[in-house]
């Protein structure tokens, strides 16, 4: 009887240890899924909540470019594909459901201008060639746009190397954006903070 009791106690301890280990593993797995590439994921609702506190800056990479795809071009061979234009329109519609009030900017390339135009479906677009130059000066350029926009939310269509630079510089993470991937920043007391990656939905 004593031997049975001792075995029962040991089994309970083993099961408790195993259960604890599984909880830890599950937590780590969940954290990894949440962080993905090391950036917090921000959906439309979270973005809208952030925009109520601070002016937000959303920087999108342009859509599928024509010169690197076998898909049908929208028009200019240096611009975007028809598929890319449709993707931009769909994303813009979903984005506007959460953020209605924003000013729109793009770099001075055909692909970013077309991406922004299809994303916005008629919203006024301002082209700024500084959104092509991505280094330490990018933050001053963004702050200039915020001032021009009188601290309204702004959406910028730019390039993958800009997003990669900001993610590395602000959070020390490697970010290799696909078409229409985006970063979310907010302005506070004249400074820009990287909040995470925009994930539609």
UniProtKB/Swiss-Prot annotation:
Entry keywords, A to Z: Hydrolase, Periplasm, Signal
Major place of localization? Answer: periplasm
* This enzyme's EC code(s): 3.1.3.-
A cellular component term, taken from the record's GO annotations: periplasmic space
Query: What domain of life?
Result: Bacteria
The processes (GO biological process) annotated in the record are: lipopolysaccharide metabolic process
Per its UniProt record, what CDD domains does this chain match?
A: HP (cd07040)
Its signal peptide is 1-35
A GO molecular function held by the record = phosphatase activity
Q: Which pathway, metabolic or otherwise, does it act in?
A: Bacterial outer membrane biogenesis; lipopolysaccharide metabolism
Record localization: Periplasm
Asked if Signal is a keyword of the record, the answer is: yes
Please verify whether the record's keywords include Chaperone.
no
Stored HAMAP family? Ais (MF_01868)
As for family, the record states:
Belongs to the phosphoglycerate mutase family. Ais subfamily.
Role, per record: Catalyzes the dephosphorylation of heptose(II) of the outer membrane lipopolysaccharide core.
- The protein's name in its UniProt record: Lipopolysaccharide core heptose(II)-phosphate phosphatase
Q: From which source organism is this entry? A: Salmonella choleraesuis (strain SC-B67)
């Amino acid at each position: 009887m004593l031997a049975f009791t001792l075995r029962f106690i040991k089994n309970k301890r083993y099961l408790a240890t195993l259960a604890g280990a599984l909880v830890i593993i599950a937590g780590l797995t969940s954290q990894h899924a949440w962080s993905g590439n090391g950036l917090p994921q921000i959906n439309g609702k979270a973005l809208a909540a952030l925009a109520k506190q601070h002016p937000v800056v959303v920087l999108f990479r342009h859509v599928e470019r024509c010169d690197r795809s076998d898909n049908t071009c929208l028009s200019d061979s240096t611009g975007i594909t028809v598929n890319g234009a449709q993707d931009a329109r769909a994303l813009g519609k979903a984005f506007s459901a959460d953020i209605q009030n924003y000013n729109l900017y793009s770099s001075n390339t055909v692909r970013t201008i077309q991406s922004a135009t299809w994303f916005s479906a008629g919203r006024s677009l301002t082209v700024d060639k500084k959104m092509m130059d991505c280094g330490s000066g990018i933050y001053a350029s963004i702050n200039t746009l915020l001032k021009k926009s009188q601290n309204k939310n702004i959406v910028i269509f730019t390039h993958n190397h800009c997003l990669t630079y900001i993610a590395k510089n602000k959070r020390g993470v490697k970010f290799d954006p696909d078409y229409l991937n985006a970063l979310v920043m907010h302005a506070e007391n004249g400074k820009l903070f990287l909040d995470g990656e925009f994930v539609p939905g």
